[in-house]
Amino acid sequence: ISASIAEICWAFQISIVLSNFASGLAAHTTYKMALLIVPLAIVAECFSWACISIENRLYCTCEESIWTVIFLIAFLGHIYLYKRVGYENPPTSLGIGYFGYSIFLFLCIIAQLLQVVLYVTRYIEDTQNNVKYKGFIQGFELLHSCKTISKNIDDWGDDAAWMTGYFSICVWSSIWLTIPPRMPNTGSGLL
C-alpha cells in the first residue's frame, strides 16, 4: 500500500510542477493535461492491485501503459513550455536545468515502455502455459494473508535491477521536485 501511495504522491508532484509552469505561462491546455496526471495515477494503481491480487499480467500491462501516458503528458507539456519560454533563459533549480527535467521524463517514458514489454511478455508466457488466474475475492483474500518471505534471489532476481533503479530514481526525483525548476519571476519554486 505504501508504494502505491508514494507513486500517487510522486504523480502529484509531477502534476504540480507542470500545472505551475502552465498557469505561469497561461498555457490552459497544458494546465488541463497536468490535472489528468493524478487521476490517471490512481487508475494505474487500481490496475496494479488487480494484477497483484489475481496475478494476471495483463493488468500490470495496463498499469505500466497508463504510467507511460502520464510521463508522456508531462514530457510533452514541459517541452512545449520550455519552447514557449525560450532557450536563452530556461529556468533552473539546484543546478539542474529545466531541459534536464524534460530529459528525465523522456527516460521515464522509455523505462515504462520496457515495463510494458516485460509484462506483455509475461502475459503471453502465462497464456501459452495455460495459467489459471485467481478471482478477485480469492486474490484479495490471499493479499490479506501473509505470503512466504523469500531471500532467495531466484524468486525476485528478475525484478531486482529495474526495482532498484526505479525506486532510487523515484526517491531522488521526489526530493528534487520539492524545489522544482521555476519560471522567471513566478515565485520561490517551493511547492
Over which residues does each language-model region extend?
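Intrinsic structural disorder
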Residues: 1-2, 153
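Internal transmembrane alpha-helix with an interfacial aromatic "cap," most often the third helix
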Residues: 2-34, 42-52, 77-85
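Small-residue hotspots
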Residues: 6, 67-68, 109
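Generic recognition of cysteine residues
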Residues: 9, 46, 51, 60-62, ...
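Short helix-loop boundary/capping segments
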Residues: 40-104
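C-terminal transmembrane-bundle signature of multipass membrane proteins
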Residues: 75-191
